[in-house]
Amino acid sequence: LDRIQKIKEDPFYKECLTLNGDRERDRLFCRHDFQHMLEVSQISYNMIAGTGSLDEFAAKEGLPGVTGASEVIFAAGLLHDIGRWRQYDTGEDHALAGAVMARPVLERAGFQKEEIKAITSAIGDHRRAGPGSSFLGRVLCLADDLSRPCGTCNVRLDCYKYEYMETIRERSRHGSLPDVG
């Protein structure tokens, strides 16, 4: 997972994390920091690998086997909120901005054209994943929701997503999550 380490060490990636932190310093609700992105990566990987779909995902996306597929999933999770600070500054959709911003980071990390396409499509889709969205984009969207620590949040009752999040969590406990396949 050398390429994942290169993402973590990328100066622009680190700068985006800092800018996200600056913009969210006084935010009461969930933050879009490295820990959140790492959790989304892990949940996304577990969702795909846990269903035995890693080989199928790799083949469908034209990726170099299970290792390549794993790196694509982790890279998408680590980069999915890279453009969040831009949304605060300009109102631009952070998913679409992030898809563009992630490309040079991925190139510097050594990802190939097909891999970059799969990752940037997923990042662009992760906010409003639905019909026509990529499989990985739908997985990221759900993992993004499942990563939120609503149960321990002091302001959860003021959060516009709280009821939805509780529904998603309850459905995940009973194995009836929305279809991401």
Specify the residue positions occupied by each region the protein language model found.
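Metal-dependent phosphohydrolase cores
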Residues: 1-181
